[in-house]
């Protein structure tokens, strides 16, 4: 009897560990961006975006509002000799707005081999809004920009006297 009870308790504990909710599902879909970014396949990257997504890439002068615009952006961004490429998100803050909408803000950086040396780009700031449409989580809003350099600390003037 104790053995069966122990198995039941383990099964219940395991089921709560493997269940995920909207927040976890949205994060998993968002992290696919970084995996696909390293492949250089702009079509696959663009497929992560909703057809009506609002998109500001690092080099976008204006908001991009069409799938063709997103593909064109990544065609330029992912072209050229890339060598080995890695991309990783970090410092993510996640806000679940509903069962179908999740906002994620954080940073990310990419690393690529250039002339035999690993070169780091970033970190960049990124904010995305993920929305569940049907059975897929898609990016409906994306804004990426360079992280500003910290301002130098200026010592306060000490009054004499």
Language-model features, listed with the residues they occupy:
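Solvent-exposed loop/turn segments at secondary-structure junctions
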Residues: 52-55, 60-62, 109-112, 145-149
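Bacterial N-terminal signal peptides that target proteins for export
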Residues: 1-7
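A solvent-exposed, acidic/Ser-Thr-rich amphipathic alpha-helical stretch
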Residues: 24, 42-100, 120-121
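A short hydrophobic beta-strand element
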Residues: 100-110
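Beta-strand elements of well-folded, non-transmembrane domains
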Residues: 38, 110-114, 130
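Short beta-strand edge/turn micro-motifs at domain boundaries
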Residues: 123-153
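Short, low-complexity N-terminal intrinsically disordered segments enriched in polar/charged residues
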Residues: 11-51, 153-161
């Amino acid at each position: 009897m104790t053995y069966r009870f122990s198995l039941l308790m383990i099964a219940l504990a395991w089921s709560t560990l493997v269940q995920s909710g909207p927040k976890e599902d949205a994060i998993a879909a968002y992290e696919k961006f970084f995996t696909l970014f390293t492949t250089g396949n702009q079509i696959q990257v663009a497929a992560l975006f909703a057809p009506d997504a609002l998109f500001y890439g690092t080099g976008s002068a204006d908001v991009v509002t069409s799938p063709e615009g997103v593909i064109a952006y990544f065609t330029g961004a992912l072209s050229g000799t890339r060598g080995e490429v890695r991309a990783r998100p970090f410092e993510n803050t996640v806000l679940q707005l509903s069962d179908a909408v999740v906002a994620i803000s954080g940073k990310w950086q990419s690393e690529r081999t250039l002339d035999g040396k690993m070169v780091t780009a970033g970190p960049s700031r990124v904010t995305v809004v993920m929305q569940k449409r049907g059975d897929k989580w898609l990016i409906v809003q994306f804004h990426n920009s360079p992280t500003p350099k910290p301002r130098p600390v200026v010592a306060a003037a000490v009054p004499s006297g």
